[in-house]
């Protein structure tokens, strides 16, 4: 993509951490419980539907007791997450903050959780075109089936320009950071020929609503 490309870049800051909702946690595949760990009051998670209220069980030599499975994030608490890179591998760490107390919940491979979300939500564009996941995530889509040179922006049809507006809106209103590189080669037999590379902050893709918006844009010219 060395020539004839159109670029939309928002050089904001990739967030160190981000707040999430219960619907996001459920999409990741977890229930949130209030109970005790080794007799101490705590919040913790288990896989959706795996544990029940009143249940005692052991993990890693520690005893867990579930007093109540939460239907929403408690009003005095925040569900937070961040991406860390350790020995070349990304991890999603998430925890619950209740006033001055922090309850670690899990540390997981973000690639596994994102795949789980995208499969559950049927976000096939994200599943098909993801290329790399770290602090940022790269998508690459090559939909060029003709021999041609990229067209200048002035020759883009209205539908293509609408896609670019949608990308700007995502960067401005939802992620604050992003880089979208686009080449358009024209329309042949009602098929748009284009190539794109899109970089977004990974944390935002754990938000179910944002993931749906990104998937929609990736498929707008198909």
UniProtKB/Swiss-Prot annotation:
Top-rank lineage group of the source organism: Archaea
Signal peptide as annotated in the record: none
Naturally occurring in which organism (per UniProt): Pyrococcus abyssi (strain GE5 / Orsay)
Protein name from the UniProt record: UPF0128 protein PYRAB08320
One Pfam family of this chain: UPF0128
Assigned protein family: Belongs to the UPF0128 family.
